[in-house]
């Protein structure tokens, strides 16, 4: 295990729900990272108060404030949990001072390559900026990729249902970016010819856990092989998101050539339809257990940065 002297120092930009949960996760679970700074814009935010109480350097003056902290010179990793628009500016500003800094983007900005740890992290260990897609993407793209490993996927559609209470101002401000980024990543990372993403904010009380439905249209293939691939992938995600689970058995439907589906932008489809149903329970480090959508983002971001930091140690 890495000692405090060999751990890489990290800063978190965004002192809201995601940033605060990420800070606690790093403190409790990280082998290679140490939280050195928490950055916000609201001096009264709970995240900054908690960070200060835990001995972490704080600033409420945004990314400019981060660069004025004495610890900035030691920072190797930055997690950005702000918004898509803010991230573009934050990354550009940081690189004027530290061109080689590693940035883990938890917004839908996607100025770096999409990263879903169980699918394509190995290809991006040296990337200066990686994008964690979205909560829906982290939950569902592994399932699309699992089918892609067995059969050619022509189309994949995901529906992410999250509790309204777990959707903070950042999530709500990025709904359009959420659907666009997730759809593109379903194709680029999941391997689908065409992808579509839908997000549903569920106002139910008491709040429901995150649930995701994945529909995959592929060429005909061995159902047992697809099911086994899905189960292996779910187990791989569970390694860093323990609350991730298949809600029920994988379902299959044959779409015959004489009764094809019509997919907008794709045309007629016949082949195999695979349906996967997922539930994500949060670890409740800082956020409630129903906020699995936020937990999977912070867990995936930490898993990504851990591997990157470990690769630097072993280089």
From Swiss-Prot:
Pfam families: AcetDehyd-dimer, Semialdhyde_dh. The lineage of its organism: Bacteria, Pseudomonadati, Pseudomonadota, Betaproteobacteria, Burkholderiales. It comes from Paraburkholderia phymatum (strain DSM 17167 / CIP 108236 / LMG 21445 / STM815). The keyword NAD applies. NAD(+) binds at residues 15-18, 166-174, 293. GO terms for molecular function: acetaldehyde dehydrogenase (acetylating) activity; NAD binding. This is Acetaldehyde dehydrogenase 2. It catalyses: acetaldehyde + NAD(+) + CoA = acetyl-CoA + NADH + H(+). Its EC number is 1.2.1.10.
């Amino acid at each position: 295990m890495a000692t405090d002297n060999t751990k890489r120092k990290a800063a978190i930009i965004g002192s809201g729900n995601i940033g605060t949960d990420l800070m606690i996760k790093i403190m409790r679970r990280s082998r290679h990272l140490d939280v050195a700074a928490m950055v916000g814009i609201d001096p009264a935010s709970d995240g900054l108060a908690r960070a200060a109480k835990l001995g972490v350097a704080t600033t409420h003056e945004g990314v400019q404030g981060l660069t004025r902290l004495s610890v900035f010179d030691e920072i190797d990793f930055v997690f950005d949990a702000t918004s898509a628009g803010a991230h573009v500016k934050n990354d550009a500003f940081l690189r004027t001072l530290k061109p080689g800094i590693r940035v883990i983007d938890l917004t839908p900005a996607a100025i770096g390559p999409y990263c879903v740890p169980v699918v394509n992290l190995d290809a991006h260990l040296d990337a200066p900026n990686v994008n964690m897609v979205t909560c829906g993407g982290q939950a569902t793209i592994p399932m699309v990729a699992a089918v892609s490993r067995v059969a050619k996927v022509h189309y994949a559609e995901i529906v992410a249902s999250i509790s309204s209470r777990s959707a903070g101002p950042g999530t709500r401000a990025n709904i359009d970016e959420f659907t666009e980024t997730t759809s593109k990543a379903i194709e680029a990372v999941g391997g689908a010819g065409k992808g579509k993403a839908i997000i549903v904010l569920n106002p139910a009380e008491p709040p429901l856990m995150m649930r995701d439905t994945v529909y995959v249209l592929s060429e005909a293939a061995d159902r047992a092989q697809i099911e086994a691939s899905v189960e292996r992938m779910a187990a791989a995600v569970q390694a860093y998101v323990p609350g991730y689970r298949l809600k029920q058995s994988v379902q299959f439907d044959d779409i015959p050539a004489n009764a094809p589906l019509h997919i907008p932008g794709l045309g007629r489809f016949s082949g195999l339809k695979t349906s996967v149903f997922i539930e994500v329970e949060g670890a409740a480090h800082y956020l409630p257990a129903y906020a699995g959508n936020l937990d999977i983002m912070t867990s995936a971001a930490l898993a990504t940065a851990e591997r990157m930091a470990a690769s630097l140690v072993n280089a």
